[in-house]
Amino acid sequence: MSAFTLASTSGGARAGILHTAHGDVPTPAFMPVGTKATVKSVDPDELRALGAAIVLGNSYHLHFRPGEELVAELGGLHAFMGWNGPILTDSGGFQVFSLRDTLLEADDDGVTFRSVYDGRAERFTPELAARIQELLGSDVAMCLDVCAPPGVPPAELEEAVQRTTLWARRQRDLPRAPGQLRFGITQGGLDTELGRASCRERVLYTV
């Protein structure tokens, strides 16, 4: 069965169902952010009562504290959080590229940055991002991408799209947690053609 079922459309809008190992998610959906494996001031029972269908966890922060290996030893992110519903983890790319003061270098192999926790130089690659999320055991893992800020020159925006595609290709067939989906991320900023090209490529690397 496909991971996504289209339920209905109206003009350019559509509604569907995302099928994951821990349940279905009606879309469009509001996704509460549990950056460090918890939604601030809301416990799992309250999340369920509020009707949350899926929760987001942040790979960047979980990698540094407490670490994906410890989360795996404790049974994975669902057990660690006390949440038995679907979980999506981002790749850490947004944090790396949006915290511009900590960014040191980005190339086709990966990105080097300073940790916001202790200032040490760290290196993220597509392979590491995939491994972190495999150990976390989320239902949906996101590919590492280059998040270009608004207003960058066209050449930099195009480079971000090309590098995001290159990284998605490398991640497509890497190991995943049982039942884990892996989605690519579309880049291109406000450039319609770049966005369309990125979207077409991303469909090929979503598994």
Question: What is the predicted function of each stretch?
Answer:
Residues 3, 162-165, 171-200:
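Glycine-rich phosphate/ribose-binding loops and adjacent secondary-structure elements
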Residues 201-207:
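Positively charged, low-complexity/disordered segments
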Residues 1-176:
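Non-catalytic, usually N-terminal nucleic-acid engagement modules in DNA/RNA processing proteins
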